[in-house]
């Protein structure tokens, strides 16, 4: 298992934006939907962060988001 930012697909490499006011709800549900233990909205970059993601789950790699792929 790993702790990291989930991405929509490995090729696109785009994190999931979130509203920092929604402390646990959206990201926690998103992460659990990807079989993680829990998740939250990281305030400094307003992106979902997951704890306990399966090792084969796509996560943020270095480089930019490619929304057009």
Swiss-Prot record:
One matching Pfam family, short form? Toxin_3
Q: Which GO terms describe its cellular component?
A: extracellular region
Please provide, alphabetically and separated by semicolons, the GO molecular function terms listed in this UniProt record.
sodium channel inhibitor activity; toxin activity
Report the superkingdom from the record: Eukaryota
Q: Which UniProt keywords apply?
A: Disulfide bond, Ion channel impairing toxin, Neurotoxin, Secreted, Toxin, Voltage-gated sodium channel impairing toxin
Q: Where is the LCN-type CS-alpha/beta domain?
A: 2-66
CDD domains reported in the protein's UniProt record: neurotoxins_LC_scorpion (cd23106)
Organ and tissue specificity: Expressed by the venom gland.
Q: What is its main location?
A: secreted
Per the record, the GO terms for biological process are: defense response to insect; envenomation resulting in negative regulation of voltage-gated sodium channel activity in another organism
User: Which Gene3D superfamilies does the UniProt entry name for this protein?
Assistant: Knottin, scorpion toxin-like (3.30.30.10)
Where, subcellularly, is it found? Secreted
Covalent S-S links between cysteines: 14-65, 18-41, 27-48, 31-50
Record text about domains: Has the structural arrangement of an alpha-helix connected to antiparallel beta-sheets by disulfide bonds (CS-alpha/beta).
What job does the chain carry out? Inhibits voltage-gated sodium channels (Nav). This toxin shows insect lethality against crickets.
Report what the protein is called.
Toxin Tma3
Organism field: Tityus macrochirus
């Amino acid at each position: 298992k790993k702790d990291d930012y989930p991405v929509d697909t490995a090729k696109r490499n785009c994190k999931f934006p979130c509203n920092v006011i929604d402390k646990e709800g959206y990201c926690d549900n998103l992460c659990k939907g990807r079989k993680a233990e829990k998740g939250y909205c990281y305030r400094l970059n307003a992106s979902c962060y997951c704890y306990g993601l399966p090792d084969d789950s796509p996560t943020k790699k270095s480089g930019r988001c490619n929304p057009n792929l």
